[in-house]
């Protein structure tokens, strides 16, 4: 066994020991587990290119969501423009058939960028947590892209799932309730991603297992960050609203879905 293989084995074993305690709050938060029928479809090797492609796009969309929250609610113009510049090369590649950039170089550039500024304490928390989330999601984006390249899986544009749109349909339309609801939706999307990584990992080869389990800690923290921000900005307890979106999310996961995606529902027959 090479040094690299020993390190991977050690890392993987540590992850396997730690991930149940990371996952437990996520499972308690979600209203249902991933249906077995989805896992059966997801573990089919023929579906791996589609699964990885949708996972890639989900990472970018998670970064976009965080960016939009910062831009709309707290960022000064220069800070907002800086954040926009972070995502533009990724968006051009993923959505507009632009050239594939050097994602490693882009990530290093992002790490050195100036942060948006605000004097509002809650706004400062939003910036700090969302900027970290953006960096992590973009890092995951190019990690998934590396996995695809290593397996000779080309990037092909695909349609979006119904999942996020289904969640956002339930968002109230006046502030600050809109913001609160969007933050709660963000929490559920991150929590479901975490749960699906864990549900799928045992059925994948060791490299993909290690990769997916390595994402659990950050995804679990992201859902908690979203929830904390929602409660902090709300003048009232948000528990009822959290339960409501839990029911919306569970219905999307448990109902038949004709399109297989990373966050799709029960595979529909026919």
Swiss-Prot record:
The protein's name in its UniProt record: tRNA 2-(methylsulfanyl)-N(6)-isopentenyladenosine(37) hydroxylase
Cofactor: Fe cation
Observed effect of gene inactivation: Disruption mutant shows normal growth characteristics after being shifted from anaerobic to aerobic conditions. Mutant shows slower growth on citrate and acetate, and is unable to grow on the citric acid cycle intermediates succinate, fumarate and malate.
Subunit composition and interactions: Monomer.
CDD domains attached to this UniProt entry: MiaE
Underlying gene: miaE
Protein family membership: Belongs to the MiaE family.
Pfam families documented for this protein: MiaE
Residues holding Fe cation 2: 137, 190, 219, 222
PANTHER family according to UniProt: TRNA 2-(METHYLSULFANYL)-N(6)-ISOPENTENYLADENOSINE(37) HYDROXYLASE, TRNA-(MS[2]IO[6]A)-HYDROXYLASE
Organism whose genome encodes this protein: Salmonella typhimurium (strain LT2 / SGSC1412 / ATCC 700720)
Domain topic, free-text comment: Binding of tRNA to MiaE induces a protein conformational change that influences the electronic structure of the diiron site.
EC code: 1.14.99.69
Organism phylogeny: Bacteria, Pseudomonadati, Pseudomonadota, Gammaproteobacteria, Enterobacterales
Catalytic activity, reaction form: 2-methylsulfanyl-N(6)-dimethylallyladenosine(37) in tRNA + AH2 + O2 = N(6)-[(2E)-4-hydroxy-3-methylbut-2-en-1-yl]-2-(methylsulfanyl)adenosine(37) in tRNA + A + H2O
Cofactor note (record): Contains a nonheme dinuclear iron cluster. Contains three different forms of the dinuclear site: an hydroxo-bridged FeIII-OH-FeIII center, an oxo-bridged FeIII-O-FeIII center and an hydroxo-bridged FeII-OH-FeIII mixed-valent center.
GO biological process: tRNA modification
Residues bound to Fe cation 1: 59, 137, 140
